Structures are given as structure tokens and as C-alpha cells.
């Protein structure tokens, strides 16, 4: 029922309600520049009036109002828009990181023209051409030595530059994973606090803002989805179908240190120790950069180093220096297999288990336009696969037709006719675990092309096949065929001119031994063959020439850089538009808040005056009516 003091109670309620509203305005203005803050507003409701419709109600006119109270303090938030921003954040995180590291990779290739690897290599071939014109010249040999050392230095410098970028990406993976775990822990902790606050029927707006901001930052690192049920303990964050957060439970990522191609490699694991193959967000980008982009660049550099070492040494070992001796390599053969049949202990158990042969040269001289006159099927293992590639040949086919089919297939070998007119089968680079390998895996011929015609294999069919898993597989090769053993690991890191050549340039070969094992004065065949490699079809992987290789390498990284830059800018604009839209809804408008402050201030003053009048009425009743 109403009373003499009901006026004071109504005024008090208004006073407190508008004071809370003014405090909320002040809170909004104080946090106007804080990232992630959502504008708050006070929702007021009219207090339940007198009298309730019941039998014992007072016999007077009603209902009589009881003033106003604060119902809730709410965030102004568009949850659907917020979810959209979180969904878009991982794309910006991915392409920002991608653009950063691709730009760093581009800087490695943006060498001064006169210091580029391509220029150094061209100068190296040119110096061999000069020696071919003056095969007895010591000065020409000294120039070859210096240019060879310069080329090796360029290869090693690029390798170490790529290695440093690999280490940067690897370190950033660890840092970013720790950052993600920090967000996951904090979100779970905030869920616990929010749950307690909501249990008291409060709206923990600032805690929820802090949680939303952390979820958004986590969404930049990895693509996440949110499931916010009515039960606050069931605020879920999913990533790649896994629970990262469930209420106050945090399932953090784990880091596992393994051996990488150059240094320690960090693997990301889920909470249950399964390996996390992340494809989105900043972490997905870093994994792609480290395990694909940088590793591919290192592998390509190893590819060119291994091939140039091989083709130059093959001719140089057959040639003779000024002392008329042969059998000397121009480039160092460090880190090669010690077994002369290419047998290798892969498992480290003390027993050979595979054969690593890089290149095989046939016994017989062949001619590209010669028709075969017979038919059969070649079988090779596919690149980075255990599948078999079959390449048929028929009687009307020429030798070059068969070579083209091999090179245009997915076989993990290439073929060409070398400078001696013999068929050369060479392995292309493959990725095994964390390292690049150069080894021929399988060669088989149902007919006579690789047996009687070229002289690579002893016999046709499966029983005559070369297979690297058979440690005696070199017995399957024709007796007079020759082969080269594979480099073990990162030839680009250790490539250098052999010490014996470095100490005495006169040992650089210019001529080729003849059938009488003598060398003729003025013989320039070794120098001439090596100088021709600059424009010859020597097959660096699937590239025909060195020029093709350099052109493809440079264009590939340039295209990737352009794509990453454009996509990052596009994604950044999309996220900016969404963020601007969110700010127009949830952001603090200072003019609007100041207008609200004046409104609430006037209401507060009115309430205080009403209380003053109510007190005067009570004073009249008590002191002036003689009661």
C-alpha cells in the first residue's frame, strides 16, 4: 500500500536509476578508444504499480505508479556481424603472413644483376669457352677457378639466406602457437568468470568484450567457429573439428621438436598429441611458408647445385689437365655416399637397405631421329608417389619421341642424349620426410629400348628391372653402362671447387683422353663440352635448359608475390568494411553520449527536486499539523 513516504521512495528510485545511467555514459566515454569495447546502454523499466488486482487491495483508484528502476545494462552488439568478422579474420591473417614472407623471398632473388647466380654461372661457362680457344692457357684456367668459386659462393649464400628465412618462419610458428595458447587459456578463464557473474543475474559486459576480442585475435591465427549456448559453461570454440575451448576447459596446442632439413623443426600437435595439419589463419600460412614455399626454394637450389656438380664433374673426370692426368673432379664431392655401388643404410641399423643412384649413362651411342623398329613399354616410378608410370613405344617411333614421352610424363626421371651421344637417365628431386633426395627408384623395359638398343639394363621384363630397394640392383645394369651416386643432403650448402683444383689450376681439364690414353696438344674437347652446358638441354628437373630453370624460378616467386599482395589488400578492405559497420553499431559516439548525459543529468536534478518537495510535505504533516 502507499504511504506518506512513498514519494521519497519514487524519487530515490529515479535518482539511483539516472545516476546509473550517467555512470554508464561516463564508462562509455572513458572506453571510447579502447579496442574491442562495445557501447553499453541502460534499459529502464517502470516499477510494478499499486495496487495488484486482488481481494485485499485498498479501496481507492489505481493503479498508482511506483517510479522507475534499472532493468539491465546491455552491450550494443550485432552478434551475427561479430561472427562474420571472426570468420574473415583468419583469411587476413593467412595472407598477411604469406605476403610478408614471400616479400622476404623476393628480396633473396632481387640480386644486383652483376652479382646474380645466373650471371656468375654464365661467366663460368664463358671462361670454359675461353679455355677451349686456348687449351694450354694457365691464365684461362685461373679465371675458370675464380669464376667457379664465385658461382659456388653465390649458391651457398642463397642457401644460407633461404635457411635463415626457414628459421624465421620456424621460430614464428613457435611464437604464434604460444600466442594462440595464451588466448585459449584466457578465454577459458574469462568463461569461468562470466559464468559466475551470470549466475548472479548480472551482465558481465566488459568481460564478454574482453572474451570477444581474444576470440577475434585467435581467429586471426587459426580459423575458429563459435557455439554459444544458453549454458555459459558450453561456450565452445572449434577449430578444424576439434574443441579448443569448452566453458572453462582449455585444450591447448602442443609443440614437438623434430629434425628439419636445416635446423630443429617445430610440429604443432592437438591436445591429444595428433599432428595438427593447419591450413588457415596465420599459423596455416606459416606452416605453408616453411614446409612448402621455403622448402621448395631450398630444394630447387639443391637441384641446380646437384645437377651442375654432376654434369661438370662427369666431363672433367674424363678430361686431363696440363699434367695429362685425369680422374679429378672439378667440384668437391663432400657428403656423398661412401659405398661405390650407392648402397645406403636408411634406417641406421648398420645394414644397407636401399641404393641411391642419381644418373645412369647408357653403353651404346644413339641418334635422336633414328626409328626404333621394335615396340615395348617402359616403367618408372612416379614423382613423389609409389605408383608406376608406363610409357609405351612402337616401331615407327624415333628415339627423340621416347625421350619426349619420358620427360612429359610424371616419371621421377628425365632423359636426354648427352654430349657423347649416349642416353642419360637422371633422377628428379623428390621430398622424403624433411629432406630432398635425388635417386632413381625404378627402371623396367618389356622390350629392347633400354637393353639391347641403348645398353642401360641387362635384361627385359620384371626380372631385369632396376629397383632401389634391392641392394644388389646395380647388377641389373649393363656392364659397360656408367652411373653416378646421389648426393645425400643439401648440396647447395657445401658446393665448392675441389681442393686439388683450388690449389693448382693447371689440373683443370681441357682435353679428353683418346683410345690410346694420351692427350693431343690443343685438345679442347672437355672445355668445349662444359662450355656448351649454358645452352644445352641438360634437364634440370623438368626444365630443358639452365635458362628455362632460372626463368621459371624467378617468374614463380614473382607471381606468388603478386597474388599474396593483391589478396592481402582485398581481404584487408573486406575486414575494414565489416569493422567500420560494427563500429557504427557498437562504437561510442561522443556527441550522442554527451546528449544522453545532459538528458540523464536533467532527470537526476528533477528527481532530487521531487525528493525535496516530498520531504517538505512530510515536514508539514509532522511539524505543522500538531500531530
From Swiss-Prot:
Family: Belongs to the flagella basal body rod proteins family.
Name of this chain's protein: Flagellar hook-associated protein 1
Source species: Borreliella burgdorferi (strain ATCC 35210 / DSM 4680 / CIP 102532 / B31)
UniProt keyword terms in alphabetical order: Bacterial flagellum, Secreted
Location(s) in or outside the cell: Secreted; Bacterial flagellum
GO biological process terms, semicolon-separated: bacterial-type flagellum assembly
CC terms in the record's Gene Ontology section: bacterial-type flagellum hook; cytosol; extracellular region
Spans traversing the lipid bilayer: none
Record bears the keyword Secreted: yes
One Pfam family cited in the UniProt record for this chain: Flg_bbr_C
GO molecular function: structural molecule activity
PANTHER family documented for this protein: FLAGELLAR HOOK-ASSOCIATED PROTEIN 1
InterPro entries in the record: Flagellin_hook_IN_motif, Flg_bb/hook_C_dom, FlgK, FlgK_helical
Gene of this entry: flgK
Amino acid at each position: 500500500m502507499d504511504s506518506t513516504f512513498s514519494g521519497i521512495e519514487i524519487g530515490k528510485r529515479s535518482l539511483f536509476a539516472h545516476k546509473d545511467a550517467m555512470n554508464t555514459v561516463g564508462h562509455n566515454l572513458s572506453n571510447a578508444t579502447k579496442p574491442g569495447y562495445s557501447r553499453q546502454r541502460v534499459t529502464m523499466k517502470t516499477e510494478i504499480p499499486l495496487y495488484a488486482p486482488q481481494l485485499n487491495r485498498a479501496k481507492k483508484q489505481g493503479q498508482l505508479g511506483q517510479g522507475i528502476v534499472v532493468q539491465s545494462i546491455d552491450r550494443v552488439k550485432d552478434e551475427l556481424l561479430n561472427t562474420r568478422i571472426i570468420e574473415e579474420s583468419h583469411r587476413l591473417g593467412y595472407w598477411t603472413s604469406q605476403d610478408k614472407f614471400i616479400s622476404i623471398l623476393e628480396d633473396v632473388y632481387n640480386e644486383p644483376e652483376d652479382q646474380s647466380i645466373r650471371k656468375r654461372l654464365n661467366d663460368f661457362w664463358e671462361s670454359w669457352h675461353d679455355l677451349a680457344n686456348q687449351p694450354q692457357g694457365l691464365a684461362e684456367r685461373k679465371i675458370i677457378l675464380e669464376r667457379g668459386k664465385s658461382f659456388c659462393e653465390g649458391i651457398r649464400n642463397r642457401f644460407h639466406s633461404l635457411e635463415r628465412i626457414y628459421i624465421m618462419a620456424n621460430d614464428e610458428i613457435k611464437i604464434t602457437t604460444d600466442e594462440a595458447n595464451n588466448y585459449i587459456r584466457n578465454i577459458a578463464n574469462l568463461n569461468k568468470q562470466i559464468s559466475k557473474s551470470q549466475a548472479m543475474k548480472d551482465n558481465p559486459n566488459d568481460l564478454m568484450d574482453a572474451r570477444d576480442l581474444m576470440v577475434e585475435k585467435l581467429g586471426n591465427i587459426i580459423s575458429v567457429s563459435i557455439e554459444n549456448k544458453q549454458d555459459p559453461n558450453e561456450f565452445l570454440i572449434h577449430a578444424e573439428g576439434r574443441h579448443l575451448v569448452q566453458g572453462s576447459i582449455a585444450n591447448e596446442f602442443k609443440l614437438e621438436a623434430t629434425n628439419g632439413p636445416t635446423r630443429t623443426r617445430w610440429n604443432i600437435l592437438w591436445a591429444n598429441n595428433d599432428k595438427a595439419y593447419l591450413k588457415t589463419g596465420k599459423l596455416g600460412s606459416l606452416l605453408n611458408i616453411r614446409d612448402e614455399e621455403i622448402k621448395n626454394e631450398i630444394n630447387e637450389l639443391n637441384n641446380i647445385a646437384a645437377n651442375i656438380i654432376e654434369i661438370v664433374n662427369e666431363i672433367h673426370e674424363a678430361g686431363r689437365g696440363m699434367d695429362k692426368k685425369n680422374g679429378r673432379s672439378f667440384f668437391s664431392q663432400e657428403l656423398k655416399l661412401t659405398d661405390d655401388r650407392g648402397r645406403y643404410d636408411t634406417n641406421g641399423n648398420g645394414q644397407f637397405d636401399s641404393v641411391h643412384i642419381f644418373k645412369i649413362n647408357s653403353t651404346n651411342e644413339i641418334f635422336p631421329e633414328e626409328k626404333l623398329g621394335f615396340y615395348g613399354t617402359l616403367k618408372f616410378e612416379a614423382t613423389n608417389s609409389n605408383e608406376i608410370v608406363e610409357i609405351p613405344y612402337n616401331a615407327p617411333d624415333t628415339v627423340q619421341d621416347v625421350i619426349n614421352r619420358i620427360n612429359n610424363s610424371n616419371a621421377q626421371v628425365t632423359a636426354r642424349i648427352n654430349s657423347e651421344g649416349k642416353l642419360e637417365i637422371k633422377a628428379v628431386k623428390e621430398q622424403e620426410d624433411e629432406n630432398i633426395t635425388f635417386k632413381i627408384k625404378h627402371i623396367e623395359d618389356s622390350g629392347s629400348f633400354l637393353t639391347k638398343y641403348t645398353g642401360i639394363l641387362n635384361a627385359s621384363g620384371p626380372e631385369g628391372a632396376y629397383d632401389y630397394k634391392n641392394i644388389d640392383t646395380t647388377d641389373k645394369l649393363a656392364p659397360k653402362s656408367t652411373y653416378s651416386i646421389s648426393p645425400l643432403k643439401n648440396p647447395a650448402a657445401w658446393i665448392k671447387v675441389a681442393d686439388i683444383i683450388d690449389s693448382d689450376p693447371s689440373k683443370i681439364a681441357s682435353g679428353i683422353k683418346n683410345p690410346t690414353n694420351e692427350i693431343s696438344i690443343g685438345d679442347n674437347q672437355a672445355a668445349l663440352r662444359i662450355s656448351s652446358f649454358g645452352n644445352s638441354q641438360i634437364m634440370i628437373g623438368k626444365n630443358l635448359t639452365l635458362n628455362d630453370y632460372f626463368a621459371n624460378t624467378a617468374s614463380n616467386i614473382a607471381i606468388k608475390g603478386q597474388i599474396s599482395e593483391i589478396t592481402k589488400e582485398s581481404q584487408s578492405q573486406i575486414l575494414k568494411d565489416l569493422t567500420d559497420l560494427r563500429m557504427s553499431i557498437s562504437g561510442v559516439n561522443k556527441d550522442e553520449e554527451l546528449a544522453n548525459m545532459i538528458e540523464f543529468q536533467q532527470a537526476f536534478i528533477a528527481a532530487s527536486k521531487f525528493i525535496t518537495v516530498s520531504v517538505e510535505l512530510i515536514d508539514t504533516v509532522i511539524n505543522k499539523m500538531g500531530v
